[in-house]
């Protein structure tokens, strides 16, 4: 049921170009787009093992719901979502890498553009610095093109890859290493002083209600604006659209009351052609 994603060198980020010549003997890639795919459970178990203990992995039922997005029909002016997982297996059929993500496109008459929310990425230590990570960062671009076509947009429309990252902290070297890896690849950070960003409170609704306090998480979006990686500013309207797309994705599974403070902050963002600084992700 799964199939191999296309290895398109032109989709590699500027800092990931060496991946085009990487030797990855025996690595087999699987693009998973259905919970019925026999490889899905392998990918889900791996992500849950690595991200579940720190409270950063969704429940199985949430991912099953997201896969149902993939068969939705376009509705004018409404968002379309496409959830997918990439699994890389080594010659012994062990997990070499796994990532999941959601492509988001608003259908016409909305402007043609695609946002890709990069959820989780895990690379086995044996394959770090091998060039595998570069491909795992590039594969979602082809899914974005597929969704643009489904929405009846032009395939050359702008594509932005987005990862939500912790704000850099001197006392958190692991976070710093992740930020530096994306920085080297060509990602830029939205200046949090100009457009502060919140991730939803991921606790169960009952836990939120019992605590009496909603706790959205301050984070920072880091972006790869495909084809515009060297630019150090972006218009506010473009960044607003990217964050709107991410919040539209979350709003499909979160209660309106839990999303309300995030939308309130979004509405207060600058708009129009106001230039928003795009910083180095590791910059404190």
What are these regions (language model features)?
Residues 1-39, 46, 50, 152-284:
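Terminal substrate-recognition subdomain of acyl/acetyltransferases
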Residues 55-58, 144-150, 187-192:
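Short, surface-exposed, polar/charged, turn-prone segments marking secondary-structure boundaries
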Residues 73, 144, 208-209:
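Alpha-helix boundary/capping detector
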Residues 109-111, 128, 173, 232:
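Short acidic, gly/pro-rich beta-turn/loop elements at beta-sheet edges
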């Amino acid at each position: 049921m799964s199939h191999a994603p296309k290895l398109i060198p032109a989709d590699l980020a500027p800092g990931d170009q060496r991946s085009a010549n990487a030797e990855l003997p025996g690595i087999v890639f699987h693009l998973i787009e259905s919970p019925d795919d026999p490889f899905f459970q392998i990918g889900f178990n791996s992500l849950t093992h690595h991200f579940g203990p720190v409270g950063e992995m969704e429940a199985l039922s949430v991912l099953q719901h997201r896969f149902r997005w993939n068969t939705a029909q376009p509705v004018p002016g409404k968002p379309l979502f496409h959830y997918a997982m990439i699994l890389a297996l080594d010659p012994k059929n062990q997990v070499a890498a796994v990532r999941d993500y959601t492509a988001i496109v608003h259908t016409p008459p909305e402007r043609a553009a695609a946002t890709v929310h990069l959820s989780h990425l895990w690379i086995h230590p044996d394959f770090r610095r091998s060039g595998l990570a570069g491909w795992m960062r590039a594969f979602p671009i082809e899914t974005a093109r597929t969704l643009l076509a489904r929405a009846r947009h032009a395939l050359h429309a702008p594509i932005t890859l987005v990862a939500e990252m912790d704000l850099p902290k001197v006392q958190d070297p692991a976070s710093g290493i992740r930020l530096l890896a994306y920085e080297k690849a060509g990602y830029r950070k939205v200046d949090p002083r100009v457009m502060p960003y919140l991730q939803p409170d991921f606790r169960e609704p009952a836990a939120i209600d019992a605590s009496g306090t909603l706790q959205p998480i301050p984070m920072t979006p880091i972006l790869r604006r495909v084809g515009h990686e060297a630019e150090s500013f972006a218009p506010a309207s473009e960044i607003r659209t990217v964050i709107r797309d991410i919040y539209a994705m979350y709003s499909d599974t979160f209660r309106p009351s839990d999303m309300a403070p995030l939308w309130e902050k979004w509405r207060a963002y600058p708009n129009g052609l106001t230039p928003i600084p795009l910083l180095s992700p590791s910059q404190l």
